[in-house]
Amino acid sequence: MDRITTRVATAAAAVGLALLAAGCSGNNATAAGTNTTPVSAASRALPSPFTITTRYTAASLGLDHPDALAIGPDGNLYVTDDSQRVTVISPAGTVLRHWGKPGSGPGEFRFIAFEPTTPTDVAGKIAVGPGGKVYVSDSGNARVQAFTPRGHFVRQFGSFGSGRGQFLRPFDLAVDNAGNVYVADDQAENVSKFSPSGKVIWQIGGASSAPDLVGHHHFTMIDAHGRIVMVNDDLQKVVYVYSSGHEVDAFSPSFPTSSTIAGACEATVDAVGNTYVSGCGLQPTGPTLVFDRAHRLIAKWPGTPYSLLRSPAFGPDGEVFALATDGTILKLHITLPGA
């Protein structure tokens, strides 16, 4: 049984248990006081706040199935794809530059799929810091590489192993305003914080951690409050963690599961605190749910005509872009209820 198929079953079981618990107790808070009450209306009809204003196909940009997308402080899009390189694209869809090739040297990448049966589920994530430095999760080489915005190699950190500062399979990563880098290791099931120079500051995960921090985690950003916004897809929870490594909030989105959707997998937060949750899918279908700051479900992308591979990314000047499962880059306009 492959990784995603296993998570379909795990997610369905987790959601079922959460709903049962919600029916038996009026207060589902954790010991840390976090909100874990499931939103049972996740499958109801809701307005879609998303309008596609522009779309760029992978072929038109010269990309070989994009894996991840980040927006830099310059407003440009930084995209990794299966050709083992980074491509920089202007908001107007002009390819500005690219760098990288297959290999293990500086500036070379080996993005690998989690399972042979899920070739598009590739660990090749990317993040851009406030100063424009670009960080790439080089999963097959068990390291993170840092570059200037023009693609010049700066440094790398990490090596293969299970020790402190090492990786088994580095996956998601994010950068805070101070330049610290947060890396989720999908195989080791932990999250590590590194200084701007690549020194380990802390590591969370494992049996000794708080329950919400045990398992597989996915994240793409630091929100306006400096919190790492993560999804524990084993427990089907969105978890918010401060830069100190301590959990400060959580909720269960009750993401719909099916034979093609393995529950919640990705989350991002906009400038006013709304959380956008997308799923791990076997097929190019599935919704994206939108929750307000009180974790109330307020809107939903229905999953058609595009299903989002990652939750929307928010640019410095209000731009919103998202990566669809077929590799199309979508520019979105979002109008939420009551806005």
Regions found by a protein language model. Give the residues of each.
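C-terminal motif of bacterial Sec signal peptides marking the signal peptidase cleavage site
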Residues: 20-23
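Bacterial N-terminal signal peptides that target proteins for export
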Residues: 1-12
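Bacterial signal peptide processing site
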Residues: 25-27
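Flexible "stalk/tail and boundary" regions
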Residues: 38-339
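Ala/Thr-enriched low-complexity intrinsically disordered regions
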Residues: 10, 34-37
